[in-house]
Regions:
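Residue-level detector of anion-binding/catalytic polar loops
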Residues: 96
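Short, conserved phosphate-binding/catalytic loop or strand-edge motifs used
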Residues: 99-108
């Protein structure tokens, strides 16, 4: 669990929660309810997430210093997405990315760093990579390059 927490570190003062209403086995998008909680991310939240206990945990990748240790390209697809083709393309291009299946049947393409980097840099890199892979219109996390105030939380991404 500690390694998972380390690689998905982000904003500490808030997190996302998602309750899944329906899981479809045919690859269609899963409906759910998501919202931000302005509470610290606790060890219990991490543990429950890894045990599959709802709500699933969402982490805001941009931290209080506008830095990130990870970012994600969120490819929405509702059926028939070819994950193997995407992974083969990433491998061929020798990109340092990790791909997971999303709840919608699409993909989450993660980029991790060993040290915190400016949110603007990781966002620009992921937008560029998304375009190279043919997914230039996909959502990219972090969505912000900076938090505008102490009350700003940015957008969260549901963890795998």
């Amino acid at each position: 669990m500690n390694k998972f927490i380390e690689i998905f570190t982000g904003l500490e003062r808030a997190h996302g929660c998602t309750y899944v209403e329906k899981k479809n086995v045919d690859g269609t998008k899963v409906k759910g309810q998501s919202f931000v909680k302005r509470q610290h991310v606790t060890t219990e939240l991490w543990s429950n997430h890894l045990k599959g206990i709802e709500p699933s945990l969402g982490i805001i990748p941009i931290n209080e210093e506008n830095k990130c240790r990870w970012g994600c390209i969120d490819i929405d697809s509702y059926a028939g997405f070819n994950h193997k083709k995407l992974i083969n393309q990433i491998t061929k291009l020798k990109l340092p990315l990790v791909t997971t299946r999303s709840k919608s049947g699409g993909a989450h393409i993660f980029l991790f760093t060993t040290v915190p980097v400016d949110a603007e840099l990781i966002r620009k890199k992921l937008i560029s990579i998304g375009s190279i892979l043919g997914f230039g219109s996909s959502e990219v996390f972090p969505k912000q390059i900076e938090l505008k105030s102490k009350d700003d939380t940015g957008n969260f991404h549901n963890l795998p």
